């Protein structure tokens, strides 16, 4: 009984696959795709620029750079003092 039902389903699926894509799903022409490449690249560049600017502004406004700088300064001074006391 299962084989009797699965064969027609298999035939219908095979027919749909062999039919190919519908006209609305067909790939666009190469020339139209090539014409849109500069616009897409410009849009990508603008988006990337905006995101980079936003990230840089976020970093500038955060306390992370100042905290990092202070930590490095403190650590460097501690190491310098330890070296002075060790080799003096």
Swiss-Prot record:
Keyword Transport recorded: yes
GO biological process: lipid transport; lipoprotein metabolic process; negative regulation of cholesterol transport; negative regulation of lipid catabolic process; negative regulation of very-low-density lipoprotein particle clearance; triglyceride metabolic process; very-low-density lipoprotein particle clearance
A cellular component annotation (GO) from this entry: very-low-density lipoprotein particle
Disulfide bridge positions per record: none
Location, primary (coarse class): secreted
Secretion signal, residue range per the UniProt entry: 1-26
Superkingdom per UniProt: Eukaryota
Keyword terms of this UniProt record: Lipid transport, Secreted, Signal, Transport, VLDL
Family annotation (Pfam families): ApoC-I
GO molecular function: fatty acid binding; phospholipase inhibitor activity
PANTHER family reported in the protein's UniProt record: APOLIPOPROTEIN C-I
Family as reported in the entry's similarity comment: Belongs to the apolipoprotein C1 family.
Role of this protein: Inhibitor of lipoprotein binding to the low density lipoprotein (LDL) receptor, LDL receptor-related protein, and very low density lipoprotein (VLDL) receptor. Associates with high density lipoproteins (HDL) and the triacylglycerol-rich lipoproteins in the plasma and makes up about 10% of the protein of the VLDL and 2% of that of HDL. Appears to interfere directly with fatty acid uptake and is also the major plasma inhibitor of cholesteryl ester transfer protein (CETP). Binds free fatty acids and reduces their intracellular esterification.
Protein name: Apolipoprotein C-I
Species name: Arctocephalus gazella (Antarctic fur seal)
């Amino acid at each position: 009984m299962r084989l009797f039902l699965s064969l027609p389903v298999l035939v219908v699926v095979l027919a749909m696959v062999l039919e190919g894509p519908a006209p609305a799903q067909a790939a666009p022409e190469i020339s139209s795709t090539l014409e849109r490449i500069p616009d897409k690249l410009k849009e990508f560049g603008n988006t990337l620029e905006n995101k980079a600017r936003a990230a840089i502004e976020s970093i500038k406004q955060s306390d992370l750079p100042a905290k990092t700088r202070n930590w490095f300064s403190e650590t460097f001074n501690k190491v310098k003092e330890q070296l002075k006391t060790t080799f003096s």
